[in-house]
């Protein structure tokens, strides 16, 4: 599925999804959890029950699947402002799931070597566990062939830093862990955990910061319901992070531009 997701974005179809654990899956815990993990960093997760004989609820296979899937579903809900901002970019043609060469064009990314990894927006590098490489009986595995472009990259779950411009092999991926890296300097708009977008606190701004020199991002929002965005009803907020010569971090959230019905000022 991973090359299909990448190819869909390159073909002008950014809102791609597929059945969690396969349409007739539902018996293999490891496949189930790995699917929930990487599809957290995709536009949509389609978990449809009733087509096959097996239940497809996120908790249907018991533990540890229930807890691990819950963790990733929670994270997906928290990343909604980040995803929504890049969904706005997709209106103009730049996909949410990006082939590596879209962000980092070079001889290596122009070939097929990075077809099993991708960028989620500009800041997350996702390298799914798509096959059994060296898995033990509990499903703990490794991932080979992770290409990190030039620059510094941070393991999203541990905070460990990696220098880019190289390929990483034998990257530890215990059962709970998706190999995902965030670009140093990233500013990630987030929100409160929620079961439905109606539960999002629009008056709360959360930014996950990875200060490195001077960086900035743009957060986009609108009413999330109507097509009023086509008439310009939406808002943008510029957020800057600057590391001073004294190694102090100055964060600037600029005044939001625009308006829409229901916007919380």
Residue ranges and their predicted role:
Residues 1-177, 183:
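Catalytic-domain carbohydrate-binding cleft regions of carbohydrate-active enzymes
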Residues 177-265:
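Accessory, solvent-exposed terminal regions and/or long lumenal/extracellular loops of proteins
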């Amino acid at each position: 599925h991973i090359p299909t997701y990448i190819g869909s974005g390159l073909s002008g179809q950014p809102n791609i999804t597929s059945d969690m654990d396969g349409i007739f899956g539902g018996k293999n815990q490891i496949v189930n959890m790995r699917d929930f993990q990487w599809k957290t960093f995709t536009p949509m997760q389609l978990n449809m029950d009733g087509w096959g004989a097996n239940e497809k609820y996120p908790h249907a296979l018991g533990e540890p699947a229930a807890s691990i899937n819950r963790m990733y579903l929670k994270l997906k809900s928290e990343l909604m402002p980040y995803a929504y901002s890049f969904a706005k970019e997709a209106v103009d043609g730049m996909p949410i799931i990006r082939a590596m060469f879209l962000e980092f064009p070079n001889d290596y990314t122009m070939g097929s070597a990075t077809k099993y990894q991708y960028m989620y927006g500009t800041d997350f590098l996702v390298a799914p566990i798509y096959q059994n490489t060296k898995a033990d009986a509990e499903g703990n595995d490794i991932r080979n062939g992770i290409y990190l472009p030039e620059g510094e990259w941070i393991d999203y779950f541990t905070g460990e830093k990696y220098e880019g411009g190289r390929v990483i092999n034998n990257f530890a991926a215990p059962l709970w862990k998706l190999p995902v890296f965030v670009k140093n300097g990233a500013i990630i708009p987030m929100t409160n955990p929620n079961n439905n977008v109606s539960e999002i606190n629009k008056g709360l701004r959360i930014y996950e910061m990875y200060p490195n020199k001077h960086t900035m991002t743009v957060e986009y929002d609108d009413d999330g319901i109507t097509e009023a965005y086509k008439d310009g009803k939406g808002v943008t907020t510029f957020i800057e992070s600057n590391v001073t010569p004294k190694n102090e971090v100055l964060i600037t959230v600029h005044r939001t531009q625009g308006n829409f019905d229901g916007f919380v000022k």
